[in-house]
From Swiss-Prot:
UniProt function note: Involved in pre-mRNA splicing.
Disulfide-bonded cysteines: none
Biased composition (Acidic residues): 391-413
Keyword Heme: no
Compartments reported by the entry: Cytoplasm; Nucleus
Protein name: Pre-mRNA-splicing factor cwc22
GO CC term, one of those recorded: catalytic step 2 spliceosome
High-level lineage: Eukaryota, Fungi, Dikarya, Ascomycota, Pezizomycotina
Biased composition (Basic and acidic residues): 51-98
UniProt keyword annotation of Ribonucleoprotein present: no
Gene3D superfamilies for the chain: 1.25.40.180
Pfam families: MA3
Length: 881
């Protein structure tokens, strides 16, 4: 019961004093008072607050949190006071004090300071203007450290001449510790840049020797510590830097000799390796400045090589070192030409021994307050002006001297080029040829060719020699294709040169025999299939009958066959249809001229690449059928006029003049062989004026004639004037220039196909093209008899006018030779009589003639000879006599 009572009680039991306990005792030893008969006193319940305080289950208050709340409250009050104070204008002293306090607080934080935005930091620094204050000097120190570190990190061979003046712009006297620490750290991180850092240190040493001495002291101490700790990496970096400082004559060569003897005194693998590296860097300088030291060092190496028990790798390193010495350090010069920036007489050499007591002045690495800060800054400004001023004058003098010397060198070089240009080119080609021929595989060949120094402007010789060597092989070797591919993919320069070589060799491919041509084509096929050169080079190819030769067509054939082998027809077709490259293939697949398109289709089909011509075939099918120049156009219109004859008749009292104009519209579908028929529609207007009765008669006539179309379609325009005397004969003068046999006819409106039987008289005609308004296609055989006055060509056609009873002769002022047959277009539509001879039947030609006669109609004439220009049939020479 007592346990249950204790558990249910809400009253905290007080802590017992030491030595006592409230643990329950045995019931025997416990004494109880006798029960009281009086009633128990009345108790009051305690208030809730008191009970919670006395309750053991209530949460206890954390004193640390209470302290934190009080601190935050105080901070808020302080911020409130600051805001209240900020409302009031602050004096300059108060601003300075506030800025200094804030800056000091940021610098003294345990984490090194929190990040401050640059704008806020600049504003904070701008508020601190007291140069004698510690805060201002600390800010200047931080800025100096960042500037020196940044300049050292970005120095290289090309900009060292510009970095050094900027470096002198900083206070290197105050920051010499920062300079030495930064340059040693950068050199250890990048050993290949050691010559550059040594050159920079040498330049600084000429003006500020204390900086160079401090750097050398720290390097020696660093080497000592690393040697004792067996730190190989630090030893290598330190000895490399010391070696290049010896080359620049900042350190004496005796220091390098001491280090070498120390490393080789008790040779181990690591010490010998470090000594070999140091000797390779400083060996040439030792050979020049102290030959006995160099001899002693190499004797020690020789003894180690023969006697010491060292690793094979280290033995090989020593052997390589002796080979480097034998080659006179051609790959390890003491000072490179671009880093030889200091004259020997200007350099200050520090003689510091390896065992000397050295003070590294580590206190220069950290900030220290300088009470005379302004005086020291002014002193360095004067020193800087002196250094940079002298440097600028020297630079100007050096520039003048270099300009003069460069002009002289250029003149000498030009003279040398003029004297030895051909020799140099031959030597270069010989070197490239021997390099290619002596290589085992293409990778070795590319490696050797990359080492060849090509003179400026002779870079195209390398691709040219590769292609020439490839062409001289009996069969194509993939060796050359792989070389060209590797060079084209290494640099864009070689890719452009190979593309230019493609255009050059395609233009001159006719100079090569078939075997060399095949090798060149396969070489470029390999280059194109591997995308080593761009496919746009094919824009130089124009595949047509006029711009290609047999050699170029063979070249294109072999090229596409090689592309088909490497890519396959499907991929090759896809490449040829590439929208980006399509303009470059317009010459290969021409669409501008149907003749060129057919030629390209036939060419690719003949070499087995007809699949590439599908687009051209489709284009050719979809072309509108053009008006063939040799065929008369359908629904074409032609106007023809012929001024026919001015004739006078002796029996008549007056003169008669007649003019006739005939306009015809013809439709003549032509066929290839056999009889060709044309349906022509003509309309003629005739106007006749006679002496006795002057009247005008316009006689529109429409006629249709079907006559065979001659093979040669010609167009002629004739102006004829005929004068008919009163006698039997009428003479007509025709100004009809004859037409050529092979010509083109344009705008023939009425093709008439009439064959006129041969006449008895013959007229001589010139071989020339005749232009007449009378367009006819009738074949007129020559006359049999020769008339002295009739020297022109006669053209006969059947017109709608009544036939004359008397024959008239036409005399032409021009005398065409009888060899060729002129063209004539006739608008007459009367059916022509059939030819009388079988020869006329075989040789009849289709012609469209439009004739307009200006002779008055005569009723008493049985046969009519008009002055139309109808091509005669082709006969023998005897027919014209």
């Amino acid at each position: 019961m007592t346990d249950s009572v204790v558990l249910q009680s809400a009253v905290r039991v007080p802590t017992p004093p030491p030595g006592t306990s409230y643990s329950p005792q045995p019931s025997v030893s416990r004494k109880r008072s006798p029960p009281s008969r009086s009633p128990s006193p009345r108790r009051r319940r305690s208030p809730p607050g008191d009970s919670l305080k006395e309750n053991g289950d209530a949460p206890r208050i954390d004193p640390e949190r209470a302290v934190e709340r009080e601190r935050q409250l105080a901070e808020r009050l302080r911020q409130h006071e600051k805001r209240e104070a900020a409302r009031k204008p602050m004096t300059e002293e108060e601003k300075q004090a506030a800025a200094k306090a804030e800056y000091e607080k940021l610098l003294n934080m345990r984490s090194g300071g929190t990040y401050i935005p640059p704008a806020r930091l600049r504003a904070l620094q701008a508020q601190i203007t007291d140069k004698n204050s510690k805060e201002y000097q600390r800010m200047a120190w931080e800025a100096l450290k960042k500037s020196i570190n940044g300049l050292i990190n970005k120095v290289n061979v090309s900009n060292i001449k510009f970095i050094v003046p900027e470096l002198f712009g900083e206070n290197l006297v105050r920051g010499r510790g920062l300079f030495c620490r930064s340059i040693m750290k950068a050199q250890a991180a990048s050993l290949p840049f050691t010559p550059i850092y040594a050159a920079m240190a040498a330049i600084v040493n000429t003006k500020l020797p204390q900086v160079g001495e401090l750097l050398l002291n720290r390097l020696i101490v660093q080497f000592r510590k690393a040697f004792k700790r067996n730190d190989k990496a630090v030893c290598i970096s330190s000895t490399t830097f010391i070696a290049h400082l010896c080359n620049q004559q900042v350190a004496h060569e005796m220091l390098a000799a001491q280090i070498l003897l120390l490393l080789l005194h008790k040779p181990t693998d690591d010490s010998v390796e470090i000594a070999v590296g140091l000797t390779r860097e400083v060996g040439q300088h030792l050979e020049e400045m102290s030959p006995p030291i160099a001899l002693a060092v190499f004797d020690q190496f020789r003894n180690i090589l023969h006697e010491a028990d060292i690793d094979k790798r280290v033995q090989y390193m020593i052997e390589v070192l002796f080979q480097v010495r034998k080659d006179r350090y051609k790959d390890n010069p003491a000072i490179k030409d671009e880093l030889d920036l200091v004259e020997e007489e200007d350099q200050i050499t520090h003689r510091i021994g390896l065992d000397d007591e050295i003070d590294t002045q580590d206190g220069l690495n950290v900030f220290k307050y300088d009470p005379q800060w302004e005086e020291h800054e002014e002193a360095y400004k004067k020193l800087k002006a002196e250094i940079l001023g002298e440097g600028s004058d020297d630079d100007e003098e050096d520039e003048d001297e270099t300009d003069e010397s460069s002009d002289e060198e250029e003149e000498e070089r030009q003279m040398e080029i003029k004297d030895q240009s051909n020799t140099d080119l031959v030597n270069l080609r010989r070197t490239i040829y021997l390099t290619i021929m002596s290589s085992i595989d293409f990778e070795e060949c590319c490696h050797k060719l990359m080492k060849i120094s090509l003179p400026p402007g002779l870079e195209p010789e390398l691709p040219s020699m590769i292609i020439e060597c490839c062409s001289q092989e009996r069969t194509y070797s993939k060796f050359y294709g792989l070389i060209g591919e590797r060079f084209a993919k290494i640099n864009r320069l070689w890719s452009d040169l190979f593309e230019a070589a493609f255009a050059k060799y395609y233009d001159t491919i006719h100079r090569y025999e078939t075997n060399r041509l095949r090798n060149i084509a396969r070489f470029f096929g390999h280059m194109l299939s591997t995308d080593a050169i761009g496919w746009h080079v094919m824009s130089v190819i124009h595949l047509n009958e006029d711009e290609t030769t047999s050699s170029s067509r063979i070249f294109i054939k072999i090229l596409f066959q090689d592309l088909g082998e490497h890519l396959g027809l499907a991929k090759l077709q896809e490449r040829m249809r590439d929208e980006i490259l399509r303009p470059s293939f317009e010459g290969l697949f021409p669409l501008d001229n149907p003749r060129n398109t057919r030629f390209s289709i036939n060419y690719f089909t003949s070499i087995g690449f007809g699949i590439l011509t599908e687009d051209m075939r489709e284009h050719l099918k979809n072309l509108p059928k053009p008006t063939v120049p040799a065929l008369p156009a359908r629904d074409a219109e032609s106007d023809s006029e012929s001024v026919s004859s001015h004739s006078t008749c002796s029996t008549c009292t007056g003169s008669s003049r007649s003019r006739s104009r005939s306009y015809s519209y013809s439709r003549s579908p032509s066929r290839s062989r056999g009889r060709r028929r044309s349906i022509s529609r003509g309309r003629s207007y005739s106007r006749s004026v006679s002496g006795s009765s002057r009247g005008r008669s316009y006689t529109p006539s429409y006629s249709r004639s079907r006559s065979p179309v001659p093979k040669s379609r010609r167009r002629s325009v004739s102006y004829s004037r005929s004068r008919s005397p009163a006698g039997r004969r009428r003479s007509s003068v025709s100004r009809t220039p004859p037409r050529r046999v092979r010509g083109k006819s344009y705008d023939s409106r009425s093709p008439s196909r009439s064959v006129t039987p041969p006449r008895r008289r013959t007229s001589y005609s010139r071989r020339d093209r005749s232009y007449s308004r009378s367009l006819s296609r009738s074949v007129t055989p020559p006359l049999r008899a020769v008339d002295a006055r009739a020297r022109g060509r006669r053209y006969s056609s059947q017109s709608l006018s009544p036939p004359r009873r008397r024959a008239e002769r036409s005399v032409s002022p021009q005398r065409p030779p009888p060899g060729r047959r002129p063209r004539g277009d006739s608008l007459s539509r009367s059916p022509s009589p059939p030819p009388r001879y079988a020869r006329e039947q075989r040789r009849r030609r289709n012609s469209s003639s439009a004739s307009a006669s200006r002779s008055p109609p005569h009723r008493d004439s049985n046969r009519r000879r008009s002055l139309s220009r109808t091509p005669p049939r082709r006969g023998r020479a005897s027919d014209y006599l």
